[in-house]
Amino acid sequence: MIIWIASYPKSGNTWVRAILCSLLYSSNGNLRLSELEKINQFPMKNHFTDLTDDMFNIEEIAKNWLPAQKKINLDNSIKFFKTHNAFCRYKNFVFTDKKNTLATIYIVRDPRNIISSLAYHYSLDIDSAKKMLFSSKRVLGNETSYKSKGHVYTVLGNWANHYNSWKKLDPENTLFLKYEDLIIDSKLQILRIANFLKKYLKVNFTDSVIENTLLSTEFNNLKFLEKRNGFYESVTNKITNKKMNFFNLGK
């Protein structure tokens, strides 16, 4: 079964995945950025290779959302997946269902603060970033990202619809995190995440793991780790063609 780490882009998804990886996969809570690769993204090309040959047809991708997830869940193990997809229907095809989804962690960020992050990450001017935020028909994915990273179409929609689509899920199995709360009181939010995980996994986190997770996922440390070792999610500026830091301002 899948536990989703869902968010609108540039809302703190990577930060939360860093916390999860620090808690679950690191040595005593001491994160290495490479460990984030243990939480894959959905949808991606490899999820659909034996389901469709038409990777550039958004309806084909939507039609196979559930079959792809059913394939992922064949081994009956719990898996974490990052997604920026809205919890939506496309041409009557639903993104996920209770047969495939165990739980969801959704991260929400003040949309006013997302705009500058979108502009930086996607090499947009501020007006274009605003249009992206408010576009009800926004879809992520293109031939370049497909060839370079295996990305297929992600149905995004606008910020409000995206948030509301995930908000309607079963509250018992959904943890909502605010990006701003992660900044104000990181330890409290880490404890909320840890307690949520205990509902689904046989895990116990010592005080030292919690403290090390707090320290190793602090923004300045993430920035340091990226500078020292690089980060696979960093992007290239489309105007200057230079590699940009993924961890930019952290505000």
Q: Which role fits each region the language model picked out?
A:
Residues 32-36, 204-213:
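Short, glycine/acidic-rich hinge or "gate" loops at secondary-structure transitions
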